Amino acid sequence: MVVYNNTPAAVMALKKSGIQTAADLSGKKMGAPVFDAGRKAFPTFAKANQVSDVTWISMDPPLRETMLVRGDVDAITGFTFTSLLNLEARGVKAEDVVLMQYADHGVKHYGNVIIAHPKLIEQNPQAIKQFLAAFTKGAGEVIANPADAIQHVKARDGIVNTGLETRRLQLAIDTVVNSADAHQDGFGRLNPGRLALMASEVSDAYGTKTRIDPKVVWNDSIL
């Protein structure tokens, strides 16, 4: 089941850097942890936007936005609902950030999904169907009332900043969960042609030993 109909990955730069478009990233220093999803998929972004000669600077996640603010790097990759709020916490106004979401720049990858083991699918598909039905019901309630959903999180983790996390959740809902594509395909479902293109691009970006077969990784018989 697809949860994030679009990848939350994005490139972010400060307007004062002079970077305005994806083409401006050529020859620049970019920063992200080595395992960052946006960094891993950047070859696809670069190909779609004719970006070349990027130098990568690696850092631990807590330093990513700090290094951008300090000018140690020209741009960063990260999830929108993480890095945008982290930049704000470091004194950067939203209007001073150049945001290039992968989904808006030729990289229509799916994001987080629910994965089931093939053995479980074969032996107990009904249990998966019931779980997905419960998840879908809960997701609908969260989308309808994000603030109330965060209160449930707060009840289990008292140090949660409800204002900040409500904004983060709403940003995630608006950009990757309750998107136009999700409305078109249906919550939890996907477009086979789009998945096939993504599989090919991911195979190229990650240098997989074998090509990814979309028919092997997607099973909608239990949705």
Spans of features found by a protein language model:
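Pocket-lining segment of extracytoplasmic ligand-binding domains
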Residues: L63-T66, R70-N161
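Conserved C-terminal helix/tail region of periplasmic/extracytoplasmic solute-binding proteins
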Residues: L195-L223
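Short, surface-exposed acidic
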Residues: D53-W56, A94-V97, I159-I173, T208-V216
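Structural motif detector for alpha-helix initiation sites
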Residues: T21-A22, P192, P214
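Predominant activation on well-ordered alpha-helical scaffold segments within soluble catalytic domains
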Residues: P43, L85, A196-A199
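Short, glycine-/small- and polar/acidic-enriched structural segments
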Residues: M1-D60, E65-R70, D74-F81, M100-Y102
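Secondary-structure end/capping motifs
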Residues: Q123-A205
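Class I S-adenosyl-L-methionine
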Residues: P43-K47, E88, K154, S203
